[in-house]
Amino acid sequence: MAVLDILTIPDERLKRKAQPVKDIEAIQGFIDDLIETMYHTDDGIGLASTQVGSTDAVIVIDLSETRDQPLVLVNPEIVEKSGEYVGEEGCLSIPGYRAKVTRFEKVKVTALDRQGKAIEIETDDFLAIVLQHEIDHLHGKVFIEHLSTLKQQIALKKVRKYA
């Protein structure tokens, strides 16, 4: 396994949209690297493939206290959403910056697990927020795009200072 470099704004590769994975067997090593990279961070609870420069549609999430229960989702899609929730978010691609973001309170996501089995997750807790955040990355969006232009500029300035 290898720790991959995490892209930070304003890297244009973060705007690329992920493509559906057709051969899950071929990306098993990459999935391991993505998990290892997430665990290598101090506080990362999720990571999308596009954050490390890949266009394979894969996200990994681990909300466990022990950080040893990764959830791997290949080709995830939000198929239902409802309600509204406002909460503070941060991002490994925007180090040192946090802001309040409005998200859906409840989501239903369909995906494949790392063995290629179809799964469905319906949640209205913190996982719902993390799923939306990571799936946004697969669509070429970072969370600050949900903010005003001024707040986006502040985030960019903080990242440049942090680098």
Curated annotation (Swiss-Prot):
Co-factor binding comment: Binds 1 Fe(2+) ion.
Keyword Phosphoprotein among record annotations: no
Catalytic activity: N-terminal N-formyl-L-methionyl-[peptide] + H2O = N-terminal L-methionyl-[peptide] + formate
E.C. code: 3.5.1.88
Cofactor: Fe(2+)
Active site: E134
Secreted listed as a keyword: no
Entry's Gene Ontology molecular function annotations: metal ion binding; peptide deformylase activity
GO terms classed as biological process: co-translational protein modification; translation
Residues bound to Fe cation: C91, H133, H137
Keywords carried by this UniProt record: Hydrolase, Iron, Metal-binding, Protein biosynthesis
Family: Belongs to the polypeptide deformylase family.
Function noted in UniProt: Removes the formyl group from the N-terminal Met of newly synthesized proteins. Requires at least a dipeptide for an efficient rate of reaction. N-terminal L-methionine is a prerequisite for activity but the enzyme has broad specificity at other positions.
PANTHER family: PEPTIDE DEFORMYLASE
NCBIfam families documented for this protein: pept_deformyl, PRK00150.1-3
Protein name per its UniProtKB record: Peptide deformylase 3
Organism name: Shewanella oneidensis (strain ATCC 700550 / JCM 31522 / CIP 106686 / LMG 19005 / NCIMB 14063 / MR-1)
